[in-house]
């Protein structure tokens, strides 16, 4: 594109690279500007936001945040830069909304990396943030901006493993659906709790405990095994590369287990695709009167964010930029996100 606009000028490509990798322009403000257009073109009253982490292949040791994570681009562990994305999972299209680099702990805490941070232009203050925490922070900008209609937030098991990370989503007035490990525990019915009687010696107890003889919590896998066949229904959950993917699903209200204690009442949704048979379980804070058909339909709305990343790599050259610094990652990512939205909107015409 540069050669087409500027001709075979010796400095044209280099100038373009410097503008993208080192230019002092506001990438965050530019990323947020199309959100109103996203809502106008693709928005829904009960929109779904998705959060996901991925890594891009990156060689060398000098690039900011480079490590050997599980790099999805090559399907193995390789030098790469990890990031967290937020997307809009509309039924008409799924554009990117936000993406931020995730710094490994050693890049933040190890003094040996201080000079690398300085050379890479990493902005202070620098703190260690897990991918779920970083994703939730970027997610909060969407409802606060007030330009996108959204009701749901979908996340993978990395998000659902720690329920305390889900609470801020509920505080934003959003309903979450996050996959959870199979060993996640809960109660079919809320167990009775009481403050133990004081025996007259030692410190007097003040905190309630689950009373003796109350039902013990069960893993979500064990709970799902007890569901009768009539509780399962079939849903079309997403579009695959070879056609629609259909899965059987069932939903049940359970009492979540929080640090050993009975927590809030939530939906437990079990999904079983017909082709693979791989079982997935997710936790939802949706109201108790939410129709099962809605839960089944939305259970497949997490994957579009993964499609965004694949589209970026295969169609837009995401990951081919040679920049090493902080801006050299943020700026190209911003342009890829804008280009991806134009690609999604163009497919509607």
Where are these regions (language model features)?
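Active-site-proximal structural scaffolding
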Residues: 9, 79, 159-162, 169, ...
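A short glycine-/small-residue-rich loop at the edge of a beta-strand within enzyme catalytic domains
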Residues: 286, 299-303, 325-329, 333
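Basic, amphipathic alpha-helical segments enriched in Lys/Arg and hydrophobic/aromatic residues
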Residues: 311, 316-349
């Amino acid at each position: 594109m540069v050669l087409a606009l500027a001709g075979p000028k010796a400095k044209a490509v280099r100038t373009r690279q410097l503008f993208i990798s080192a230019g002092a322009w506001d990438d965050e403000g530019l990323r947020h500007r199309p959100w109103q257009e996203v809502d106008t073109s693709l928005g829904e009253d009960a929109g779904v936001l998705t959060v996901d982490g991925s890594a891009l292949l990156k060689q060398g040791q000098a690039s900011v945040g480079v490590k050997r994570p599980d790099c999805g681009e090559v399907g193995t562990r390789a030098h790469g830069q990890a990031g967290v994305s937020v997307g809009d999972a509309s039924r008409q299209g799924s554009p990117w909304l936000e993406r931020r680099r995730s710094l490994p702990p050693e890049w933040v805490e190890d003094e040996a990396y201080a000079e690398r941070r300085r050379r890479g232009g990493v902005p202070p203050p620098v703190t260690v943030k897990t991918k779920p925490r970083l994703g939730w922070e970027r997610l909060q900008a969407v409802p606060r901006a007030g330009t996108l209609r959204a009701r749901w937030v979908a996340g993978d098991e990395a998000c659902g493993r720690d329920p305390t990370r889900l609470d801020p989503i509920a505080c934003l007035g959003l309903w979450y659906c996050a996959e959870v490990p199979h060993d996640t525990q809960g109660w079919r019915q809320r167990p009775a709790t009481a403050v133990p009687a004081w025996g007259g010696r030692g410190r007097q107890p003040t905190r309630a405990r689950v009373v003796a003889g109350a039902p013990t919590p069960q893993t979500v896998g064990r709970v799902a095994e007890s569901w009768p066949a009539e509780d399962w229904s079939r849903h079309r959950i997403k579009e695959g590369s070879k056609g629609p993917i259909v899965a059987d699903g069932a939903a049940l209200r359970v009492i979540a287990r929080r640090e050993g204690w009975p927590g809030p009442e939530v939906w437990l949704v079990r999904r079983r695709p017909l082709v693979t048979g791989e079982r997935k379980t997710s936790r939802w804070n949706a109201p108790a009167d939410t129709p099962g058909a809605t839960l089944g339909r939305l259970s497949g709305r997490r994957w579009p964010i993964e499609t965004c990343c694949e589209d970026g790599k295969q169609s837009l050259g995401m990951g081919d930029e040679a920049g090493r610094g902080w801006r050299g990652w943020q700026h190209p990512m911003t342009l890829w996100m804008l280009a991806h939205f134009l690609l999604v909107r163009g497919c509607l015409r």
